[in-house]
Swiss-Prot record:
Entry keywords, A to Z: Cell cycle, Cell division, Mitosis, Nucleus, Phosphoprotein, Repeat, TPR repeat, Ubl conjugation pathway
Processing after translation: Phosphorylated by CDC28, which is required for the early mitotic activity of the APC/C in its CDC20-bound form.
Record protein name field: Anaphase-promoting complex subunit CDC16
Organism this protein belongs to: Saccharomyces cerevisiae (strain ATCC 204508 / S288c) (Baker's yeast)
Cell compartment(s), UniProt: Nucleus
Keyword Cell division in record: yes
């Protein structure tokens, strides 16, 4: 059922045919009077905007339901008089979400609203009909109008106009005149024929599927034909503003303000100036008539304009240094006593469902303090903004993204928020807020919230849910998994600024220089004035060890966005790598002041002082970092190293064991895990717990066999425990992996010298091996002797034969004399031969 734009008769579209129904003039007049929509003017004498209202209070879509309902019970004269009263545009008895329901930015769809395409209900009938659902007062009908900018969200007869316009465009020769009813029938037939022709051209041979869009004009909807000229101009202005046609919006808004002289109309004209970057004109408009003193919306807009003009002191003068709407303690006590006394007249202020202006002003105050580098007051203002209205998510995000709160303070603030204001949406909103908190603590709770959002609310592919997983992986040094998650998001949103910093960090950690180069090149072409662009370029040069170029672009990135923490830390790192300690300390100190809730600048300050051998100063900064984030393995590792250098090995072991406990779920091949294991092994070595130290090193060696330092450390421990062969093997392996390892070279030299000079036990493997080798040598020598005796030398043989002949002759002479020592003489001769042979 539709209402004709030019008459109050209604018609029903059935299969492309328009069936017309007549209404009596009396019924028509009653329809006009009962469905009259009254534009709200909160600046009327009966009510003005308060800090509990939002800009919805000045929206042209706000209606007065109760006033329209009470008009039916009034006499005609009294009813007309009431319509003329300016204060009739306001009624505080309506639902606090009434204006929100009527806003074009809100979509309220019932589950039983029919979809645009459904099969015909009666296939036997020549005209297939679809029964439409009747929409209640607070419900909106889904619209698939191609001519409507707002689609299914528009809650007024602006949708009716667009629907009729679409219908008029779809047929030829359709003319509607309230004076000629027959034209409607003819045009209905023409519409049916046109639809049939169009379907035949498209090749549809089956039954036609049509859609019946039924709207009922109620007191909560806008009927353009029932609005006054000024109200229609306001709708025109609003629609032009929503479509970013600022010249049209400015032209109409200026006329509306001149006609009405209403501060709300001045506010919307100022909005047009503000959105068109004409901030000076917005300031002149509001200050010329002192509108900031009578309209809180104009005051807020004036403060925004001053901020855009970087006139922060003027902006602070407009909105105040403190929240003027904060309750006085005495007033709060009085209200508490009256509530305890069951005072029925005491009630909470009724809001319109939008973000309260009080919260918006607190947020703007925080932005001003943040721009002035007054971070403590900025933190307090942002915290007050989110506590005043939990719907002000931007204030909550500023506290987290700008590192104004420590991880524990973030969770404390989250626990203090009252999510009951969201009603039935409490669960989803609580989880959506939780996934933005710090990942250094309560990681299990955040992981559980991610699972709930993915399973119960089908948000597994949502950017913020994936970003939460990215932050968890990056914090736990799971760079490969983090890189995969980042790439899934960047496939659909290539330049997502929330994902790019972690993605760039993963590329650097994994030494993926090619992807880092391509990303930096695309960013430089697309966003040459973005801080993330030059951060990526600087990180690429850092991966190439071109420190001077990296320093240049880190500086440029920090200038473009002074609140970009990663750029500040990278800029300070370049000075530290170049050995410029003073400049590095200055840069780290600046980052520590800019980001009071971040522990990394304090950690790096401690590392710089430790490199300068100022262990007491290093300890003080490490303690500050530990107080902010006690579960960061980097902090615990550096504290262990610091106490190791102070020869306090018991304390060093305490912090390193705690760090090892924290990184048990981290990637075992990450540099963080390896460093902690190595440092803990050296600590055990200093405490003469060599076996535990060896186990510690071998545990890492199972995960990373290509680390030269691990082999060097194991070689030293085996050398200390007199296991020379294992020591020499590991030291050789260390030098194979890193030939310029001076420690391994020195240790190997000592091991080889010790292997020569050290007296070993009889049971030592080297002794057993030596005995086996010596026995084999003797056997070989004996065999060689036997072989050498078989060699033929004529000269020697002649001498030996001559000698033997002489001996033989002497023996014969002795035998002739009857001597009895022939045997003995023979034996002595054999001994002398053997002796000669041995000497040879």
């Amino acid at each position: 059922m539709k209402f004709c734009l030019y008459c109050c008769h209604c018609y029903i579209v059935i299969c492309g045919k328009a069936t017309h129904y007549y209404k009596s003039s009396k019924a028509t007049s009653n329809l006009k009077s009962s469905n009259r929509v009254l534009m709200r003017n909160p600046m009327s004498p009966s009510e003005q905007h308060s800090q509990h209202n939002s800009t919805l209070a000045a929206s042209p879509f706000v209606s007065n339901v109760s006033a329209a309902r009470t008009q039916q019970s009034l006499p005609t004269d009294a009813q007309n008089d009431r319509l003329q009263q300016p204060w009739n545009r306001t009624n505080t008895a309506t639902s606090p979400y009434q204006s929100l329901a009527n806003s074009p930015l809100i979509q309220k769809l019932q589950a039983n609203i029919m979809t645009p395409h459904q099969p015909s209900a009666n296939s036997n009938s020549n005209s297939n009909s679809i029964t439409g659902n009747v929409v209640n007062d607070n419900n909106l009908l889904a619209s698939m109008s191609k001519n409507s900018m707002f689609g299914s969200t528009i809650p007024s007869t602006l949708r009716k106009v667009s629907l009729q316009r679409e219908y008029k465009d779809s047929v030829d020769g359709v003319v509607r005149d309230e004076d000629n009813d027959e034209d409607v029938h003819n045009n209905g037939d023409a519409a049916a024929n046109a639809n049939n022709d169009r379907e035949s051209k498209l090749g549809h041979n089956g039954p036609l599927t049509t859609t019946t869009l039924t709207t009922t004009t109620t007191a909560t909807q806008l009927d353009v034909s029932e609005l006054s000229a000024i109200e229609r101009l306001r709708l025109w202005r609003f629609d032009a503003l929503m479509q970013h046609m600022y010249r049209t919006a400015e032209y109409i808004a200026d006329k509306v303000y001149n006609i009405s002289n209403d501060p709300d109309d001045a506010f919307w004209l100022g909005q047009v100036y503000y959105n068109n970057n004409q901030y000076v004109r917005a300031v002149e408009l509001i200050t010329r008539n002192n509108l900031d003193g009578v309209n809180i919306l104009c005051r807020y807009l004036l403060g925004l304009s001053f901020v855009k003009l970087q006139r922060f002191d003027d902006a602070l003068d407009v909105i105040g240094e403190y929240n003027p709407f904060s309750e006085d303690p005495s007033t709060t006590a009085a209200n508490t006593m009256s509530n305890n006394g069951n005072n029925s007249n005491t009630s909470q202020p009724v809001t319109d469902g939008g973000i309260k202006m009080e919260s918006s002003l607190c947020f703007l105050r925080g932005k001003i303090y943040f721009a002035q580098n007054n971070f403590n007051k900025a933190r307090d203002a942002f915290r007050e903004a989110i506590l005043v209205d939990i719907k002000n998510f931007e204030a909550f995000e500023m506290l987290l993204s700008k590192n104004l709160l420590t991880p524990q303070e973030e969770w404390d603030l989250f626990d203090s928020l009252d999510f009951k204001e969201f009603g039935e949406d409490k669960e989803i909103m609580k989880n959506l807020y939780k996934i933005n908190l710090s990942k250094y603590i309560n990681t299990e709770d955040i992981t559980k919230s991610n699972e709930i959002l993915a399973k119960d609310y089908k948000l597994a592919d949502n950017v913020d849910v994936v970003r939460s997983k990215v932050d968890i992986c990056y914090t736990q040094c799971k760079f490969n998994e983090c890189l995969e998650l980042c790439e899934t998001v960047l496939e659909n949103d290539e330049f997502n600024t929330n994902i790019l910093p972690a993605y760039i960090g993963c590329l650097y950690e994994l030494s993926n220089k090619n992807k880092l180069f391509l990303l930096s090149h695309r960013l430089a072409e697309t966003f040459p004035k973005s801080a993330i662009t030059w951060f990526s370029v600087a990180t690429y040069y850092m991966s190439l060890d071109r420190i001077s170029e990296a320093q240049k672009y880190y500086s440029k990135s920090s200038i473009l966005d002074p609140s970009f923490a990663a750029a500040w830390l990278g800029f300070a790192h370049t000075y530290a790598l170049e050995g410029e300690q003073d400049q590095a300390l200055t840069a780290y100190s600046t980052a520590s002041r800019f980001f009071p809730g971040m522990h990394l600048p304090k950690l790096f300050l401690g590392m710089q002082f430790m490199a300068m051998n100022s262990l007491n100063l290093a300890e003080s900064y490490f303690v500050l970092a530990y107080d902010i984030c006690p579960n960061d393995p980097l902090v615990l590792n550096e504290m262990g190293v610091m106490y190791f250098k102070k020869n306090e090995f018991v304390k060093a072991k305490k912090y390193l064991k705690k760090a090892l406990e924290v990184v048990k779920d981290l990637d075992p091949s990450s540099r963080t895990t390896i460093s902690i294991q190595l440092n803990l092994g050296h600590t055990y070595r200093k405490l003469n717990e060599n076996e535990i130290a060896i186990k510690c090193f071998r545990c890492v060696l199972e995960k990373n066999d290509k680390n030269s330092e691990i082999h060097c450390s194991l070689g030293y421990l085996y050398l200390k425990t007199k296991k020379l062969q294992k020591a020499i093997d590991h030291l050789h392996k260390s030098l194979y992996l890193k030939p310029n390892n001076s420690s391994a070279t020195a240790l190997l030299k000592n091991a080889l010298e010790l292997n020569v000079t050290l007296s070993l036990d009889a049971s030592h493997p080297l002794i057993d091996k030596s005995n086996l080798m010596s026995q084999a040598s003797k056997d070989k020598a004996s065999l060689n002797k036997k072989r050498s005796s078989l060699t033929y030398d004529p000269v020697n043989m002649a001498k030996r034969l001559r000698t033997q002949k002489e001996i033989f002759d002497q023996n014969n002479k002795a035998l002739r004399k009857g001597g009895h020592d022939s045997k003995t003489g023979s034996n002595n001769a054999d001994d002398d031969f053997d002796a000669d042979m041995e000497l040879e």
